[in-house]
Structure formats: structure tokens, C-alpha cells
Curated annotation (Swiss-Prot):
An individual GO BP term: 'de novo' NAD biosynthetic process from L-aspartate
Lineage: Bacteria, Pseudomonadati, Pseudomonadota, Gammaproteobacteria, Enterobacterales
Domain of life according to the entry: Bacteria
EC number: 1.4.3.16, 1.5.99.-
Positions marked as site (Important in orienting the L-aspartate substrate): 121
Residues at which FAD binds: 16-19, 38, 45-52, 223, 375, 391-392
Needed co-factor(s): FAD
Keyword DNA-binding: no
Protein name (database record): L-aspartate oxidase
Signal peptide annotation: none
Role according to the record: Catalyzes the oxidation of L-aspartate to iminoaspartate, the first step in the de novo biosynthesis of NAD(+). Can use either oxygen or fumarate as electron acceptors, which allows the enzyme to be functional under aerobic and anaerobic conditions.
Taxonomic source organism: Escherichia coli O157:H7
Enzyme class, first EC level, given as a word: oxidoreductase
Cofactor details (free text): Binds 1 FAD per subunit.
GO molecular function: L-aspartate oxidase activity; nucleotide binding
Length: 540
């Protein structure tokens, strides 16, 4: 039995960060758009991004330099075409953001002219990071949200989780296999609704919540990667999860990130005894790429048996620190730490998913009509390690590129008037919610211990056995009980955990963010780790 559609649009965008909202605004003058947000519309990784956006605005810088820096940080397996595509379109996409009203910091040059204040971060050979103090993501997100909420062709559905994608062949529709919409969990009504769309875009962010310690907000549960996999899309390079070197080590602020820009402006990493250690690991010192810095911190913590290392910028003038890092300064002061006077305790934490759903230059996946942009996707830009401040840039460039392709294809898109309703005829209300909570904590703990910064084959095998057991329990629970937010996220996280481990087991080398004691050397020839649904394989 089919039902009239509860929601219908030209384009359904799942996710409300920089990728999803920039795409929505580019499409909305010509198309009807629905944006799903799991929580409040501003909640997501974009809002919490501190550093900035990389683009060539300085006349002493060049696109070629941006490309080469990205390739070096990516440890030899970036897709050069993707890197050149993003770097060459960076300035125009950042300019679009400025045209929307985003205010980046400026300063007065010695000649009296005003220009953007550009910072330098790890891996960059030039100052090319546009920023809004130390809260760039907040400035970007609040500006885009304001524009989206006031656009007549954009509907934002808050507290709405995508349960799964609706694929044509799975509901008996003839013709080319394509996405026709999604089932959506309305958390306010506690019911699953149907949403038809001529095109669906995954802009759901990454999967760092699969780890016990993360800088990401709670919504980063790998939903888009898991849904795309279940829909039949390939994924790639999920073994490369970036651990940000400097998350605050404090019981009252476990998810708080200390931006790369602190080290870009001269902060040192120190042992508990006050000595620096980064020069022992890399000639670039504190400005080495994140994978090297995170491993160095992890090494020193384990070698010394220390709970944390320290980040120290107190040798810089206090006014300079307060001017450039006002949000961090106030946050730390509220926790009893004076950034201008003392070192800050830090630990690495899961931060960014460098792999994801395989896409082309326009964000197209393996399923007709389905796109993936931003952190959920694998474009080839990041390779084995993302360079600082390339993530928001990737959101903007592929938001633009996907909008061009969707608009070009929209006249030929299929339209339908009914979809099958969500079937709850054989499920009941859950009676043991503790099962979800227990499995949730178990998953995140063993992923941190076995599939973290340093790995071994035995640890990966042990993790995969645990994942298989959890999947059986969760699948049984999902089949018999009504859905909930925690169940949906756990189901997706366990699926992504499996994909991460399988990718990691395929890579018989240590490269970038994937470091294994069993294969500490680099292979001479390497490439992306690609998984295909129903036929796990590697393609190098």
C-alpha cells in the first residue's frame, strides 16, 4: 500500500552545515529545497570550527603552492585532479561566502590599505587561512542559517533524522535504479515520515562519534556513510580518521578543540616538565601535519605515563592572545585556566573522517540522483591526512559544483506522487533501552583502544569480532522495536565502525593517519582503499 507524501521537494538535503546550507542557498532560487537537521539547525561540526578556510588571497601565495601543500599533507595518495579542482575554485567559493555576509577578520597593511588577516596553520607554506577571530565556523554557520531560514523556497526541518534512503528498485519502481527520497524520523512527533525528492544530497558530516574521545558534536554518527552503503554506494579510505592533536583535557569540557591557529601563531607543545618535544619528531616542529603531531603526543603520553601534554602560548603578549583567540581565552578562563599565563593541558581526539562515500567532481555517488558533499564524502582531496582548513573549503566547492549538476539534471528527473509508508506493523515499544546504552559505550571504547592512533592486526581483528557481535544484537533490536534517535545513531555507527576496520585491515603499510606496528613502512605504490557493498575489495 502506498501513501500520499508527507513531504515533497525537488532537492532533499540531509544536513545543515556549511555543505548543506551553501548548496541549499545556491539551489533555492530555482528549486524547492528541504533541509533536514538532526537537532537545532546550527548544531553540527561547522558551528564549532575554529580555524578558518584556506584560499589564495595573498599575492605572494599561489594555487600551485596550495596544491603542493595539500598533496604533501595527504601523504602521497591525494587525487591530484581533486586537489587542483578545489584549490583553483577556492577563492571564488570563499568570495561567494563573503557575498552572503560572512565577515572575515581584516587588518591595515603598512601602506594603509585594508586586507584580510590571513593566518598560517600546520602543513601550509604560506599564510592563506581566512578566519573570523577563533570562531570562523560560528560566523559561517549563523550567516548561512539566517539566509536559509528567510528564503521562501527552503524548508528547514529541525529534530529530524533520516532513517534510510528510499531506492527505486527496493520499492518496485521500474527503470534506472535511483534514489526517490528518504524515510525521516520526526523526533517531535516520534514517528517516521516519508519525503520524496527528485535529488537527495547527503551533507551529514563525519563519523568521529565512533570513538570515545572526539572534538565533534554528538550528531557526528556517520549517518550518511551508513545510509549510502546500505543503498549500494562504494566507500573509500575510511581507515584515515584524523585525530586532532590538541583537544582540551578537562573533565568539564571534553569536546573542546584548541585550534591549529594557536600553533600557527607560535604556541609550543610541551611535556609536563616544560620541555618541548616536537623538534624531536619533525623539522617543522609544531607546524608539522596533524597526523605527525597527534602521534608524537600519543607517543610521549605513553612513554611518560602521562595523562596529557601541554600547549603553551604564554610567551606571546597577552593582548595579542586575547585579540586573536577571544573565544578560547574566555572559555578557558571560565574553567580556571589563563591562556596568557599558563600552559593548557591537551590530548588528541577524533576530529575528522578523511574517507567517505565515493563521489565525482559534482558530488555524484554510485546511485542515480544521490549526492554526497562535505565530510561525508570521499573526493580524493585529503588523501591519507587532511590539511588544516581545507574542510570548510571542500564543503563550499562541492556545494557549488553539486548545485550546478543538480540544476542541469533537474528537467530530466523522475517525479512520483506516492511512496510506501514506514511499516511498524510488526514492532513494539522497546523494553530494554539499557541495551542501546551499553552497546554504545562498548563500541566507542574498543574503537578507541583497538582502532585509534596506533593499530595492530590483532587489535583490528579483535575489534571486528566485537563489531560483528554488536551488529547481530542491533539488527535484532532494530527489527523488533520502534526506532529512536539513539538506536538510529548506534545502528549507523556500528556499520561505519565495520567499514573503518575493514579498510584498515586492507592497508598493509603505515601512511598518514593510519599507523600500524605490524606494517610500519610505506609501500612504494599505493592508492585508496575502496569497499563495495556485497563484495568487499581493495582497489589500489
Amino acid at each position: 500500500m502506498n501513501t500520499l507524501l508527507e513531504h515533497s521537494c525537488d532537492v532533499l538535503i540531509i544536513g545543515s552545515g556549511a555543505a548543506g546550507l551553501s548548496l541549499a542557498l545556491r539551489l533555492a532560487d530555482q528549486h524547492q529545497v528541504i533541509v533536514l537537521s538532526k537537532g537545532p539547525v546550527t548544531e553540527g561540526s561547522t558551528f564549532y570550527a575554529q580555524g578558518g578556510i584556506a584560499a589564495v588571497f595573498d599575492e605572494t601565495d599561489s594555487i600551485d603552492s596550495h596544491v603542493e601543500d595539500t598533496l604533501i599533507a595527504g601523504a602521497g595518495i591525494c587525487d591530484r585532479h581533486a586537489v587542483e579542482f578545489v584549490a583553483s575554485n577556492a577563492r571564488s567559493c570563499v568570495q561567494w561566502l563573503i557575498d552572503q555576509g560572512v565577515l572575515f577578520d581584516t587588518h591595515i597593511q603598512p601602506n594603509g590599505e585594508e586586507s584580510y588577516h590571513l593566518t598560517r596553520e600546520g602543513g601550509h607554506s604560506h599564510r592563506r587561512i581566512l578566519h573570523a577571530a577563533d570562531a570562523t565556523g560560528r560566523e559561517v554557520e549563523t550567516t548561512l542559517v539566517s539566509k536559509a531560514l528567510n528564503h521562501p523556497n527552503i524548508r528547514v526541518l529541525e529534530r529530524s533524522n533520516a532513517v534510510d534512503l528510499i531506492i527505486s528498485d527496493k520499492i518496485g519502481l521500474p527503470g534506472t535504479r535511483r534514489v526517490v527520497g528518504a524515510w525521516v524520523w520526526n523526533r517531535n512527533k516520534e514517528k517516521v515520515e516519508t519525503c520524496h525528492a527528485k535529488a537527495v544530497v547527503l551533507a551529514t558530516g563525519g563519523a568521529s562519534k565512533v570513538y570515545q574521545y572526539t572534538t565533534n558534536p554528538d550528531i557526528s554518527s556517520g549517518d550518511g556513510i551508513a545510509m549510502a552503503w546500505r543503498a549500494g554506494c562504494r566507500v573509500a579510505n575510511l581507515e584515515f580518521n584524523q585525530f586532532h592533536p590538541t583537544a582540551l583535557y578537562h573533565p568539564q569540557a571534553r569536546n573542546f578543540l584548541l585550534t591549529e591557529a594557536l600553533r600557527g601563531e607560535g604556541a609550543y607543545l610541551k611535556r609536563p616538565d616544560g620541555t618541548r618535544f616536537m623538534p624531536d619528531f619533525d623539522v617543522r616542529g609544531e607546524l608539522a601535519p596533524r597526523d605527525i603531531v597527534a602521534r608524537a603526543i600519543d607517543h610521549e603520553m605513553k612513554r611518560l605515563g602521562a595523562d596529557c601534554m601541554f600547549l603553551d602560548i604564554s610567551h606571546k603578549p597577552a593582548d595579542f592572545i586575547r585579540q586573536h583567540f577571544p573565544m578560547i581565552y574566555e572559555k578557558l578562563l571560565g574553567l580556571g585556566i589563563d591562556l596568557t599565563q599558563e600552559p593548557v593541558p591537551i590530548v588528541p581526539a577524533a576530529h575528522y573522517t578523511c574517507g567517505g562515500v565515493m563521489v565525482d567532481d559534482h558530488g555524484r555517488t554510485d546511485v542515480e540522483g544521490l549526492y554526497a558533499i562535505g565530510e561525508v564524502s570521499y573526493t580524493g582531496l585529503h588523501g591519507a591526512n587532511r590539511m588544516a582548513s581545507n574542510s570548510l573549503l571542500e564543503c563550499l566547492v562541492y556545494g557549488w559544483s553539486a548545485a550546478e549538476d543538480i540544476t542541469r539534471r533537474m528537467p530530466y528527473a523522475h517525479d512520483i506522487s506516492t511512496l510506501p509508508p514506514w511499516d511498524e506493523s510488526r514492532v513494539e515499544n522497546p523494553d530494554e533501552r539499557v541495551i542501546i546504552q551499553h552497546n554504545w559505550h562498548e563500541l566507542r571504547l574498543f574503537m578507541w583502544d583497538y582502532v585509534g592512533i596506533v593499530r595492530t592486526t590483532k587489535r583490528l581483528e579483535r575489534a571486528l569480532r566485537r563489531i560483528t557481535m554488536l551488529q547481530q544484537e542491533i539488527d535484532e533490536y532494530y527489527a523488533h522495536f520502534r526506532v529512536s534517535n539513539n538506536l538510529l545513531e548506534l545502528r549507523n555507527l556500528v556499520q561505519v565502525a565495520e567499514l573503518i576496520v575493514r579498510c584498515a585491515m586492507m592497508r598493509k603499510e603505515s601512511r598518514g593517519l593510519h599507523f600500524t606496528l605490524d606494517y610500519p613502512e610505506l609501500l612504494t605504490h599505493s592508492g585508496p582503499s575502496i569497499l563495495s557493498p556485497g563484495n568487499h575489495y581493495i582497489n589500489r
